[in-house]
Amino acid sequence: MTSYALVGDVGGTNARLALCAVATGEISQAKTYSGLDYDSLEAVIKQYLSEHKVTVEHACIAIACPITGDWVAMTNHTWAFSIAAMQQNLGLKHLEIINDFTAVSMAIPMLSEQDVLQFGGTSPQPGKPVAVYGAGTGLGVAHLVNVDSRWISLPGEGGHVDFAPNSEEEDRILAVLRQELGHVSAERVLSGPGLVNLYRAIVISDGRLPENLAPKDVTERALADSCTDCRRALSLFCVIMGRFGGNLALNLSTFGGVYIAGGIVPRFMEFFKASGFRGAFEDKGRFKDFLQDIPVYMITHQQPGLLGAGAYLRQKLGYTLHP
């Protein structure tokens, strides 16, 4: 009889829950719930378990916020809870609450060639450090290292490092955003809201008034080539994604690869392929040659957060991770 654990991937908007086969890591019966419809994460979990008529002893939930102790307060949601209290209330033997990009990073050892697209570089070097980042509601970042055949995720809040412009155009963008925001982090330009910030800053720096656009509007107009400012914004987004990814690669010499996750880039994949992303990734002056061989991958797996939450839990339970 198959033994299942509960896994979850919770963002600022939705909570995705599923079952993970403990022996194999296979994810099944995934369902997405709107976070606006429930007063707490615990209520969502109880609803899922009731609907699927399943009892579990182990669970791992990935959440889009820092995890620094027993008390968890979500960054982009009103939900807050005690891990110990939730474990007791749900009757679980084992509950892990991890950062969302810890989960995404832990999915990487489970990915097959069919789950990724490569953007330049050569083959990854086995056992070498890995970086993963992704733009969605915010900008998530993590690294992954292999120690004694176990994968260790190094989560952090890398999306909140300073935005570091490296061109005259980016200097103008920073000047506009600094006037509005004060501190300008990388997330302020590499995220859904960040894409809008880029569009607005481009228009304002030209002495004009921007329209009130949503991220979807900027992307659609850019792809339709119906708005020069939107196309400039999307092009700049791709370039800054490349610069940021190159910075991550330098941090830990990630010859195991740099992986991109998140909900934004897959919406304009062909545009991204033709953009200045890879050139910006390698544009590190004296260290250009150092970065040329490092492969970059787009994660195309539909649920890397769930897959990684399961992988994290299974490794805690003593299993070895592989696709």
UniProtKB/Swiss-Prot annotation:
Class in the EC hierarchy, top level: transferase
Assigned EC number: 2.7.1.2
Primary localisation category: cytoplasm
Keyword ATP-binding: yes
Single annotated GO MF: glucokinase activity
InterPro entries per the UniProt record, alphabetical: ATPase_NBD (IPR043129), Bacterial_glucokinase (IPR050201), Glucokinase (IPR003836)
Binding site for ATP: G8, D9, V10, G11, G12, T13
Transmembrane spans: none
Keywords for this protein: ATP-binding, Cytoplasm, Glycolysis, Kinase, Nucleotide-binding, Transferase
Catalytic activity: D-glucose + ATP = D-glucose 6-phosphate + ADP + H(+)
Entry's localization field: Cytoplasm
Keyword Nucleotide-binding: yes
One matching Pfam family: Glucokinase
GO BP annotation list: glycolytic process
GO terms for cellular component: cytosol
Family: Belongs to the bacterial glucokinase family.
HAMAP family linked: Glucokinase
Name recorded for this polypeptide: Glucokinase
Organism of derivation: Yersinia enterocolitica serotype O:8 / biotype 1B (strain NCTC 13174 / 8081)
Gene of this entry: glk
